[in-house]
């Protein structure tokens, strides 16, 4: 731990000063992605410097075979819930109120955005302008953000079913329901699940195992920042494949261990988040796993707009502060150059964002 972090957090609760109970740990003998036993230490003495909840210090290993990263040892499934005491999906997000008076400029932006959403995803938002579907193509950064909010899903036909795994407080399912999907979710965190249920969403408290009987049932399944949290990602993707109808779509969004941010900020990169992030993929390892399980038409999406937020959070962590602090932060000339002058390849983006289809028989 850096001296800066020691000094800054001296007046805060420092849960890492206590060890995670030894009887609540499990060892990881082989890579959870490719089953290789060959590995090197990527980072050690990692702490929960994101939410300041979890005790213990942790070691992140890099698999020599597939370049994925994983914790060993790690909290076992029975105890991992202790690391989620103040997780950000416990509360309900703000709802857009189109009745609020805004400036003419912001009203036009909203009309154009709503016009694009209505055309592309099937929402019925008002006020809306049909020009939105054309103007959106001229603003690639904003288009990326809008498409990722709706997870690149097709416009649904009647009675198409969507499942969100790890749905949190239901923010995305509210959007998908508005677009015409028949939505449901599963969420292991009772606090987050109850927040979603209070919004009238069908959410089961637990894991995907609750839905084992619904083979070939869903037209789309989404996993946004979920797969890095599970102990057995391969089994999760196999279960998703069974639940999807032939030709059904899966959407995945997860941190990228090969990103520029991971290289620049190292143990303070926001995407590590020990001990909640158990496995961190790179694009090649995730795509290889999907192909082996039975997915096709894998399409990596470009979400470069997320870089600045990740860099700012990581810089705050580097300074020993919470990534969600409101204090201003200086990124430094090199990071600013990365943001303003570079257009990173998809394998260097902060997140792996992709869609794939279950192979049709």
Task: Identify the function of each model-found stretch.
Residues 65, 88, 256, 304, ...:
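Non-catalytic surface loops within mature trypsin-like serine protease
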Residues 67-179:
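Extended interfacial segments that mediate partner engagement and assembly in macromolecular machines
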Residues 72-75, 227, 256, 304:
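Flexible, active-site-proximal loop/turn residues at the rims of small-molecule/cofactor binding pockets
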Residues 3-8, 16-32, 38-39, 143-268, ...:
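Conserved SAM-binding loop
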Residues 70-72, 80, 172-173, 192, ...:
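Short catalytic/ligand-binding loop motif for oxyanion handling, primarily in non-cytosolic enzymes
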Residues 2-30, 41, 45-53, 299-361:
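A C-terminal cap/extension of S-adenosyl-L-methionine-dependent methyltransferases
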Residues 76, 189, 209, 303-304:
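Residue-level "edge-of-site" marker
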Residues 5-110:
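N-terminal juxtadomain amphipathic helix
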């Amino acid at each position: 731990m850096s001296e800066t972090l020691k000094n800054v957090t001296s007046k805060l609760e420092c849960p890492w000063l206590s060890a995670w109970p030894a009887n609540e740990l499990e060892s990881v003998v082989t890579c959870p992605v490719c089953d290789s036993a060959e590995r090197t230490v990527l980072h050690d003495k990692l702490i929960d410097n994101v939410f300041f909840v979890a005790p213990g210090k942790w070691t992140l290993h890099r698999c020599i075979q597939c370049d994925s990263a994983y914790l060993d040892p790690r909290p076992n499934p029975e105890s991992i819930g202790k690391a989620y005491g103040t997780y950000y999906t416990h509360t309900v997000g703000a709802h857009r109120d189109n009745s609020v008076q805004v400036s003419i400029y912001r009203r036009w932006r909203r009309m154009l955005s709503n016009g694009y959403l209505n055309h592309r995803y099937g929402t019925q938002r008002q006020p809306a302008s049909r020009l939105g579907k054309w103007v959106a193509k001229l603003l690639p950064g904003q288009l990326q953000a809008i498409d990722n909010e709706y997870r690149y899903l097709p416009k649904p036909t009647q009675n198409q079913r969507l499942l969100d795994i790890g749905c949190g407080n239901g923010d995305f399912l509210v959007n998908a329901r508005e677009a015409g999907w028949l939505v449901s979710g599963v969420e292991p965190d009772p606090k987050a699940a109850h927040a979603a249920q209070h919004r009238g969403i069908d959410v089961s408290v637990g894991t995907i195992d609750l839905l084992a009987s619904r083979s070939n049932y869903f037209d789309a399944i989404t996993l946004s920042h979920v797969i890095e949290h599970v102990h057995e990602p391969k089994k999760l993707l196999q279960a998703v494949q069974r639940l999807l109808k032939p030709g059904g779509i899966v959407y995945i969004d997860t941190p990228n261990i090969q990103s520029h941010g991971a290289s620049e900020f190292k143990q303070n990169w926001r995407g590590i988040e020990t001990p909640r992030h158990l496995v961190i993929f790179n694009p090649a390892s995730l795509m290889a796993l999907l192909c082996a399980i039975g997915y096709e038409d894998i399409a990596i999406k470009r979400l470069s707009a997320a870089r600045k937020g990740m860099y700012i959070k990581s810089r705050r962590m580097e300074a020993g502060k919470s990534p969600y602090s409101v204090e201003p932060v200086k990124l430094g000339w090199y990071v600013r150059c990365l943001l303003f002058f570079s257009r990173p390849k998809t394998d260097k983006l902060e997140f792996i964002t992709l869609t794939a289809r279950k192979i049709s028989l």
